[in-house]
Amino acid sequence: MSCMGAAVNIITTDGPAGRAGFTASAVCSVTDTPPTLLVCLNRGASVWPVFNENRTLCVNTLSAGQEPLSNLFGGKTPMEHRFAAARWQTGVTGCPQLEEALVSFDCRISQVVSVGTHDILFCAIEAIHRHTTPYGLVWFDRSYHALMRPAC
């Protein structure tokens, strides 16, 4: 699986169960009518109960140079320290949007399918916020790679 390159994303939520976020590369477009993404989340992850209860999330696609933030959200760092390391806006669903992301997709979880150890979260896009940063970040062969041509 390490040879499957993918965009690096920070998935965030905020709601009745609290604020949480994690780094994910298992994210992709499902359909444009209605606009839907999918996000894969391990049911054993510490953030799973928060996302499961809140039922909203924001997919923040990272830009080149945001590797430290990806590592922070991918580790065991307490949530308040993760969110303190960047600037955030609040999306229409109430989820945190990373100000310097390449793009942020503000979503409601419309369906959940369990496969093995993971839940596949189907996410209906409510709003898209495109940022001015042009260069993307991908994860390939267990390392980060900056896209040095404009991604959007």
UniProtKB/Swiss-Prot annotation:
The keyword Protein biosynthesis does not apply. It is an enzyme of class 1 (oxidoreductase). It catalyses: FMNH2 + NAD(+) = FMN + NADH + 2 H(+). The keyword Heme does not apply. Signal peptide: none annotated. InterPro entries: Flavin_Rdtase-like_dom, NADH-dep_flavin_reductase, RutF, Split_barrel_FMN-bd. Its EC number is 1.5.1.42. Keywords: Flavoprotein, FMN, NAD, Oxidoreductase. Induction: Up-regulated by the nitrogen regulatory protein C (NtrC also called GlnG) and repressed by RutR. One of its GO terms (molecular function) is FMN reductase [NAD(P)H] activity. One of its GO terms (biological process) is nitrogen utilization. Catalyzes the reduction of FMN to FMNH2 which is used to reduce pyrimidine by RutA via the Rut pathway. Belongs to the non-flavoprotein flavin reductase family. RutF subfamily. This is FMN reductase (NADH) RutF. It comes from Shigella flexneri. The lineage of its organism: Bacteria, Pseudomonadati, Pseudomonadota, Gammaproteobacteria, Enterobacterales. The gene is rutF.
